[in-house]
Amino acid sequence: MTTQVPPHSVQVHTTTTHRYEAGVVPPGARFETSYEAGVKAASIYHSERGPTTSQVLAVLAGLPVGGILLLLAGLTLAGTLTGLAVATPLFVLFSPVLVPATVAIGLAVAGFLTSGAFGLTALSSFSWILNYIRETQPASENLAAAAKHHLAEAAEYVGQKTKEVGQKTKEVGQDIQSKAQDTREAAARDAREAAARDAREAAARDAKVEARDVKRTTVTATTATA
């Protein structure tokens, strides 16, 4: 008697991944046509790229403001050109008065601006110096020593400058004295030369007068003898 072996059951489990051959449509699947896919992609693109609310509000607020500003720019340009056309003949007629007045006003304004700039620069310099001194000083107990040191340096600098100024003043005085002496000597020399020249001219004139008198006397004596 033969023994029968029961058949083995084999279970096959399908995976979640499927591979379909070209042209084979699985049951229950639906493929979109190219037209439907294009329309859907265009609608998605336009929905993503469409203007937002903030952009619409910005356009609605910017267009009136830009138009008003452009209108004001045109009106301002027209008014400026009209005023220039009207003021040019008047400026030509009254230029002898307006030009000096304009120059004077410009110089005054420039003077005020220059004075203010110098004042602000000076105040800024003082503020910077004070801040620099406050930052560079190590501690409060060294302030007195630093101040004494700075005062000593300032006194030494002033003394040196005073000595240099005195030396220069002395040199200038000596130069002036030497120039004055040279001037006096030149004046005395010129006076002596002038006196000698006058004496020579007087002697020559006297000699001419004496010669003329002698000649006249000789002529008179000759006439009397004849």
From Swiss-Prot:
Region (Hydrophobic) location = 77-130
Entry GO terms, CC? membrane; monolayer-surrounded lipid storage body
Q: Where are the sequence repeats?
A: 159-165, 166-173, 184-191, 192-199, 200-207
Q: Does the keyword Endoplasmic reticulum apply?
A: no
Q: Where is this region: Disordered?
A: 164-226
Q: Where is the composition biased (Basic and acidic residues)?
A: 164-173, 181-216
Region described as Polar:
1-76
Give the start-end ranges of region 3 X 8 AA tandem repeats. 184-207
A single GO BP term for this record reads: response to freezing
Q: Which residue stretches belong to region 2 X 7 AA tandem repeats? A: 159-173
Q: Pfam families from the entry? A: Oleosin
Q: Where does the chain cross the membrane?
A: 56-76, 90-110, 111-131
Q: Name the predominant localization.
A: other
Q: What membrane topology term does the record carry?
A: Multi-pass membrane protein
Q: Which PANTHER family match?
A: OLEOSIN, OLEOSIN 20.3 KDA
Family, similarity comment? Belongs to the oleosin family.
Protein task: May have a structural role to stabilize the lipid body during desiccation of the seed by preventing coalescence of the oil. Probably interacts with both lipid and phospholipid moieties of lipid bodies. May also provide recognition signals for specific lipase anchorage in lipolysis during seedling growth.
Q: What is this protein called?
A: P24 oleosin isoform A
